[in-house]
Amino acid sequence: MASTFSFDIVSDFDRQELVNAVDQVIRDIKGRYDLKDTETTVELVEESINVSTDSEFTLDSVHTILREKAAKRNLSQKIFDFGKVESASGNRVRQEIKLKKGISQEIAKQISKLIRDEFKKVQASIQGDAVRVSAKSKDDLQVVMQRLKQEDYPVALQFTNYR
């Protein structure tokens, strides 16, 4: 049996669930009476979602639908970074919604500092865009997980590689 236990803190999302959510948004837009004739387009590219529509009101409706469908598929709302609304040709508006993935160095340092300050028997180390947390007791790791869930970070945190 291992003498130390560990887990990784990451910020990631299931790409296939996001694809499914965007497909549902597109189907909803085609089916909803108030959005049917707006020529709204929603496309998922590598690191963002591009939305183009007739008005800001319609854009807000698309945001609402996207948030609902993402929530139903267990995707955090924190993965969406709504960019500024740009006017496009012909009284249209467009917006790029960036997808957040990975933990920045600043947030990783905050997490590491919180763990060091509050939990003396637990070690945290920053490894790229993840934080590895290790301890001799699984119970200590579970307490750390509960404490981190109480914090409100600007990214969605997941706990992986629990060993």
UniProtKB/Swiss-Prot annotation:
What high-level taxonomic lineage is stated for the organism? Answer: Bacteria, Bacillati, Cyanobacteriota, Cyanophyceae, Nostocales
Q: What is this protein called?
A: Nucleotide-binding protein Npun_R4736
Residue ranges annotated as coiled coil are none
A Pfam family this protein belongs to?
DUF520
Concerning its family, UniProt says: Belongs to the YajQ family.
The reply to whether Transport figures as a keyword in the UniProt entry is no
> Which keywords does UniProt give here?
Nucleotide-binding
Enumerate the CDD domains for this protein.
YajQ_like (cd11740)
Of the GO CC terms on this record, one is: cytosol
A Gene Ontology molecular function term for this protein is: nucleotide binding
InterPro entries attached here? DUF520, UPF0234-like_C, UPF0234_N, YajQ-like_sf
Say if the entry is tagged with keyword Membrane. Answer: no
Q: What does this protein do?
A: Nucleotide-binding protein.
Cystine connections: none
